[in-house]
């Protein structure tokens, strides 16, 4: 179960890096919400 969350997190992170030019993105991974701004900063929320 923990491996599934980690794999999902890395998958979402890779997907975010692949589409970084899209601007602000909201990523749901591992039970957390990662918000990527145009400055490539991540805000982590539970």
UniProtKB/Swiss-Prot annotation:
Tissue distribution: Hemolymph (at protein level).
Gene Ontology biological process terms, A to Z: antifungal humoral response; defense response; innate immune response; response to bacterium
Signal peptide: 1-22
Alphabetic keyword roster: Immunity, Innate immunity, Secreted, Signal
A cellular component annotation (GO) from this entry: extracellular space
Inactivation phenotype: Adult males infected with spores from F.oxysporum or F.verticillioides display reduced survival.
Induction entry: By bacterial and fungal infection (at protein level). Detected within 24 hours of bacterial infection (at protein level). Induced by Gram-positive bacteria M.luteus (at protein level).
UniProt subcellular location: Secreted
Additional facts recorded: 'Daisho' is the Japanese term for a matched pair of samurai swords, one short and one long, and refers to the role of the two Daisho peptides (Dso1 and Dso2) in defense against fungal infection.
Role this protein plays: Peptide which plays a role in the humoral immune response to a subset of filamentous fungi, including F.oxysporum and F.verticillioides.
The protein, known as: Daisho2
Lineage of the species this protein comes from: Eukaryota, Metazoa, Ecdysozoa, Arthropoda, Hexapoda
């Amino acid at each position: 179960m923990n491996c599934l969350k980690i794999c999902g997190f890395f998958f979402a992170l890779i997907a975010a890096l692949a589409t970084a030019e899209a601007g602000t993105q909201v990523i749901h991974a591992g039970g957390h919400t990662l918000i990527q701004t145009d400055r490539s900063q991540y805000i982590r929320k539970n």
